[in-house]
């Protein structure tokens, strides 16, 4: 029951469900051709249908923060179409622009919509985050052999692959060490901790939990991303912004965006249908890439410098200009 103040005054203490409430609310906006509505990861939210039905001549922008399609093993809850976006795709003729994070995702989404006989609106590639203006190069001395990962602790993030790779790499180079930032469900976290414990790796692999990493990244030499996929990867962007060398699996989309082979790190060949079932061989390749990065100090310093250069493409003014261009181009 709505209280008799604010919007409650409009509805005179009527008992209505949330869909009807949102429909009435959207109607009161009186949307017109000068209005732009941005739906930010709203696939499950109840205002989508009322907004579509009452948009008038306003413009709709739909922002995708996750992938639209998953192969087997790639996601714990979805297979093939990502049903978070089902309604958007079914009624895509009502949308003026889809916004995704990368050009690779843009091409993939366009092909997907055509394959499923969906209307293809304009699609723009605009990163979902930015590196602050005036961010300076770190003057910190980076810890020798240090690796950082920053993500949820979930199977899709491949932390088990990373841990096993570091264990193998440490057998060759005893300076290599890993700090794991992030949290997850207790069962999976315990599984990861047991891998470390059983290998006797507690002294060089540490679980750091969740924290603000803004002042932490610059202490590390290498950022590792062994996710099975990354729609964008804000932590990857933050890492290149602080000049870290990069290593990860050759998967869509974020790893390929921020890891430039032989420029700021290495991408490791990966095929989910074969490698996911044979992680031991995969870990041999990923461990070799980690060892290689630390073999040559001069090359590692060059990787750091190149990451800073790559980060320039993601400064705030660059991202702002992309949004301004999109708004200017809305038909």
What annotation goes with each model-predicted range?
Residues 1-11:
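Single conserved hydrophobic/aromatic residue that forms the stacking wall/gate
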Residues 48, 85-86, 90-121:
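A short, active-site helix/loop in glycosyltransferases that binds the activated sugar's phosphate group
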Residues 145, 149-168, 190:
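A conserved mid-protein helix/loop that constitutes part of the nucleotide-sugar donor-binding site
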Residues 190-210:
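Nucleotide-activated donor-binding/catalytic signature segment of Leloir-type glycosyltransferases, i.e.
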Residues 245-249:
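Short hydrophobic beta-strand element within catalytic cores of glycosyltransferases
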Residues 130, 150, 177-191:
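Glycosyltransferase donor-sugar binding loop
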Residues 18-21, 69-90, 132:
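Nucleotide-sugar donor phosphate/pyrophosphate-binding loop at the beta->alpha transition
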Residues 228:
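Aromatic "clamp/platform" in nucleotide-sugar-dependent glycosyltransferases that forms part
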């Amino acid at each position: 029951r709505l209280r008799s103040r604010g919007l409650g005054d409009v509805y005179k203490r009527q008992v209505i469900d949330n869909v009807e409430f949102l429909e009435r609310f959207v109607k009161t906006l009186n949307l017109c051709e000068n209005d732009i509505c941005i739906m930010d990861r709203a696939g499950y939210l109840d205002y989508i249908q009322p907004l579509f039905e009452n948009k008038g001549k306003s413009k709709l922008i739909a922002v995708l923060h996750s992938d639209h399609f998953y192969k087997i093993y790639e996601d714990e809850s979805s297979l093939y179409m990502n049903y978070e976006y089902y309604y958007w795709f079914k009624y895509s003729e009502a949308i003026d622009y889809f916004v995704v994070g990368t050009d690779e995702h843009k091409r993939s989404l366009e092909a997907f919509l055509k394959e499923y006989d969906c209307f293809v609106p304009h699609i723009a590639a605009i990163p979902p985050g930015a590196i602050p203006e005036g961010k300076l190069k770190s003057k910190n001395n980076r810890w020798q052999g240090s690796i950082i990962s920053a993500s949820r602790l979930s199977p899709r993030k491949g932390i088990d692959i990373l841990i096993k790779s570091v264990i193998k790499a440490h057998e060759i180079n005893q300076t290599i060490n890993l700090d794991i930032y992030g949290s997850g469900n207790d069962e999976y976290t315990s599984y990861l901790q047991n891998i470390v414990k059983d290998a006797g790796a507690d002294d060089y692999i540490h679980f750091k939990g969740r924290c603000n990493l803004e002042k932490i990244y610059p202490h590390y030499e290498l950022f590792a991303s062994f996710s099975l996929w990354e729609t964008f990867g804000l932590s990857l962007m933050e890492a290149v912004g602080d000049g870290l060398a990069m290593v990860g699996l050759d998967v869509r989309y974020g790893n390929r965006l921020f890891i430039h082979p032989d420029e700021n790190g290495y991408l490791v060949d990966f095929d989910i249908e074969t490698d996911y079932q044979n992680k031991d061989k995969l870990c041999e390749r990923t461990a070799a890439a980690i060892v290689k990065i630390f073999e040559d100090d001069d090359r590692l310093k060059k990787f750091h410098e190149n990451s800073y250069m790559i980060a320039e493409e993601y400064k705030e003014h660059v991202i702002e200009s992309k949004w301004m261009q999109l708004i200017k181009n809305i038909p």
